């Protein structure tokens, strides 16, 4: 039942999915956001740097960025700005090794690492009456998985969730990213991920074989040799199987909106959970014809998807 219609119509040039995706990431200009950084210590003696916009509101939105993003990502900054202007406090996560400083432990972030999201929720829990989770791409997978996988008891203070451009089937998305038209995206990810692995190897020289980087040609290769092994999975296949959020969507009990553009170059057909939305009373799906990956460009300071986030949170 909750498959929602949408009114997204991009400016003419941005009907091309790669332009919508690339412009949003590389060329968008956003108004300054003044965050206050706080460091959270984790149970395994590591840390998370969280950037806050705090006001008198008793409502807070936790923002979860995508692969190799941070609180500096344009979509995080714009969403934080819009939400704060409309009465919400904001906590923008920086995952492990994403705040500009290497984390202490061998483990890093990944698409299924919901324990770190849980730590941030517990940190803000005493000070707010209503908590909302918003995730983009990998961060959206975290939000959906956290709400559906029953590893953690969900606080009654969590009121609603929004996820944007989410590879809910990680294996399907990894195959889509291997298409030749997506080479630029994969190259950009692998460039920064490889640099991080060199720093990790300097920190933990006996824990993995850095020479495997020479074999890495795709993100799947990287996940096979590094992401999976460092974070306790057998291989990329095991990681994708266990961390994909699609399998957990039927268990979601809070109002949750997923917006995936039909022309998203990162997504396979399996990343559009139509059946799950049809069978759910809490999970809402929007599939605009255009939008690219975390694009949804529109005129003005804020993008169409950011207004959808605000509208959904306001209603819940």
For the regions a protein language model found, what residue spans apply to each?
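Short beta-strand/loop motif that positions the catalytic acidic residue
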Residues: 252, 258-260, 264
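N-terminal cap/lid segment of alpha/beta-hydrolase-fold proteins
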Residues: 14-55, 297-300
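Alpha/beta-hydrolase-fold enzymes
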Residues: 132-230
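The serine-hydrolase catalytic nucleophile loop
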Residues: 69-81, 269-270, 299
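Catalytic histidine-centered segment of alpha/beta-hydrolase-like enzymes
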Residues: 291-304
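Short beta-strand element of the alpha/beta-hydrolase
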Residues: 58-66
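Conserved alpha/beta-hydrolase
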Residues: 72, 80-104
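Catalytic nucleophile-loop/oxyanion-hole region of alpha/beta-hydrolase
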Residues: 96-132
């Amino acid at each position: 039942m909750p498959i929602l219609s949408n009114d997204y119509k991009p400016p003419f040039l941005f009907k091309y999915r790669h332009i919508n995706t690339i412009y949003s990431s590389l060329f968008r200009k956003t108004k300054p956001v003044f965050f206050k950084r706080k460091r959270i210590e984790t149970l395994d003696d590591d840390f998370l740097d969280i950037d806050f916009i705090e006001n008198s509101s008793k409502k807070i939105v936790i923002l979860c960025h995508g692969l190799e993003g941070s609180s500096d990502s344009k979509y995080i900054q714009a969403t934080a700005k819009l939400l704060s202007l409309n009465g919400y406090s904001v906590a923008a996560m920086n995952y492990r090794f994403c705040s500009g400083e290497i984390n202490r432990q061998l483990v890093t972030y990944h698409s299924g690492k919901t324990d770190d999201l849980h730590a941030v929720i517990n940190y803000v829990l005493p000070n707010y009456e209503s908590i909302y989770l918003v995730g983009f791409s990998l961060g959206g997978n975290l939000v959906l998985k956290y709400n559906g996988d029953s590893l953690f008891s969900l606080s009654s203070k969590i009121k609603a969730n929004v996820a944007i451009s989410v590879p809910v089937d990680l294996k399907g998305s990894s195959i889509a990213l291997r298409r030749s038209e997506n080479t630029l995206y994969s190259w950009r990810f692998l460039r920064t991920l490889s640099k991080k692995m060199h720093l990790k190897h300097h920190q933990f020289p006996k824990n993995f074989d850095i020479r495997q980087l020479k074999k890495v040609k795709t993100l799947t290769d990287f996940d096979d040799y590094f992401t999976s092994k460092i974070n306790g999975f057998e291989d990329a296949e095991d990681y994708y199987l266990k961390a994909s959020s699609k399998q957990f969507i039927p268990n979601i009990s809070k109002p949750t909106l997923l917006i995936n553009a039909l022309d998203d170059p990162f997504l396979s057909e399996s990343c559009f959970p139509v059946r799950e939305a049809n069978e759910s009373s809490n999970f809402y799906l929007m599939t605009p014809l255009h939008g690219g990956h975390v694009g949804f460009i529109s005129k003005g300071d804020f993008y169409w998807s950011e207004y959808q986030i605000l509208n959904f949170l306001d209603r819940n």
